[in-house]
UniProtKB/Swiss-Prot annotation:
<feature type="binding site">
    <location>
        <position position="12"/>
    </location>
    <ligand>
        <name>a divalent metal cation</name>
    </ligand>
</feature>
<dbReference type="GO" id="GO:0005737">
    <property type="term" value="C:cytoplasm"/>
</dbReference>
<keyword id="KW-0963">Cytoplasm</keyword>
<keyword id="KW-0378">Hydrolase</keyword>
<dbReference type="GO" id="GO:0004309">
    <property type="term" value="F:exopolyphosphatase activity"/>
</dbReference>
<dbReference type="InterPro" id="IPR036523">
    <property type="entry name" value="SurE-like_sf"/>
</dbReference>
<comment type="similarity">
    <text>Belongs to the SurE nucleotidase family.</text>
</comment>
<dbReference type="InterPro" id="IPR030048">
    <property type="entry name" value="SurE"/>
</dbReference>
<dbReference type="GO" id="GO:0000166">
    <property type="term" value="F:nucleotide binding"/>
</dbReference>
<dbReference type="InterPro" id="IPR002828">
    <property type="entry name" value="SurE-like_Pase/nucleotidase"/>
</dbReference>
<comment type="function">
    <text>Nucleotidase that shows phosphatase activity on nucleoside 5'-monophosphates.</text>
</comment>
<keyword id="KW-0547">Nucleotide-binding</keyword>
<feature type="binding site">
    <location>
        <position position="13"/>
    </location>
    <ligand>
        <name>a divalent metal cation</name>
    </ligand>
</feature>
<dbReference type="Pfam" id="PF01975">
    <property type="entry name" value="SurE"/>
</dbReference>
<dbReference type="GO" id="GO:0046872">
    <property type="term" value="F:metal ion binding"/>
</dbReference>
<feature type="binding site">
    <location>
        <position position="43"/>
    </location>
    <ligand>
        <name>a divalent metal cation</name>
    </ligand>
</feature>
<dbReference type="GO" id="GO:0008253">
    <property type="term" value="F:5'-nucleotidase activity"/>
</dbReference>
Length: 264
């Protein structure tokens, strides 16, 4: 009799996030699910690893832990080195369901994507999944996570029944359009798009007159680009975007030009 698959789950919205709980519910029929998630929201923490303070696992329920003040990367790193230290490693790591998009340059900030990145660094298949929303989350309140759940079930089943579609040190970045499941046109392989973030920070003053800042993001502007369909274009057209992301950020096409420039 074959052993049940081992699935490790995390996120960057915190252990109480409805997106995380929806993901866990979808994955339970597919294998044994272990959850290790941050205690609080860690959005935009990137691939941050905590090196200056101690971290502690807190058991919330069976096979469900919060990592006290840890980042998503901490969650994966410590899970693989401690919780799974004497056992078979997870068959897959899934990060999400993030509340909000992680498209284009978002992934350089994203704790959700970075958890999948840490998984593939450790030699384990990784998927980051994010639910795009509209109108301050109204689309999630209306449609829930049904499409995201259906999508991740299909992807994980396909991987478990066949193989992971990418070579080492590459992960899948999945973005779910903000539509009812019945209106989705299917999956589309994409590349990362480009966006203009702009600059925005609110200045305030405390009762002592000292200034402090809140970093905010204005309305994001997607940049139209030629070539293969981008993630934001696919989502805009009601497709589920799946982007293969590699950790090697070398601009290989520029190496020769750089050598020529150095030798001038």
């Amino acid at each position: 009799m074959s052993k049940r698959k081992q699935i490790l789950v995390t996120n960057d919205d915190g252990y109480e996030s409805e997106g995380l709980l929806a993901l866990v519910e979808a994955l339970k029929p597919l294998g044994d699910v272990t959850v290790v998630a941050p205690t609080t929201e860690k959005s935009a923490c990137g691939h941050s690893l905590t090196l200056t303070r101690p971290l502690r696992f807190v058991e919330v329920s069976e096979h469900f832990y919060k990592l006290d003040d840890g980042t998503p990367t901490d969650c994966i790193f410590l899970s693989l080195t401690k919780l799974f230290a004497n056992e078979k490693k997870p068959d897959i790591v899934i990060s999400g369901i993030n509340i909000g998009a992680n498209m284009g340059e978002d992934i350089t900030y994203s704790g959700t994507a970075s958890a999948a990145m840490e998984a593939v660094l450790q030699g384990i298949p990784g998927i980051a999944v994010s639910q795009v929303y509209m109108n301050s989350g109204a689309s999630i309140r209306e449609f829930g996570y049904e499409l995201a759940q259906q999508s991740i079930i299909k992807l994980v089943q396909k991987i478990f029944e066949g193989s992971y579609p990418l070579p080492d040190r590459k992960f899948l970045n999945v973005n779910i359009p903000p539509i009812p499941a019945a209106e989705c046109k299917g999956f589309k392989s994409t590349r990362l798009g480009n966006k203009h973030y702009g600059f925005h920070a609110e200045v305030h003053y405390n009762p002592r007159g000292l200034e402090y800042y809140w970093i905010g993001l204005p309305r994001l502007e997607w940049m139209e680009t030629a070539g293969h369909t981008t993630d934001f274009e696919a989502v805009k057209e009601d497709y589920i975007s799946i982007t293969p992301v590699q950790l090697d950020m070398t601009s290989h096409s520029d190496i020769h030009n750089l050598e020529e420039w150095l030798n001038k």
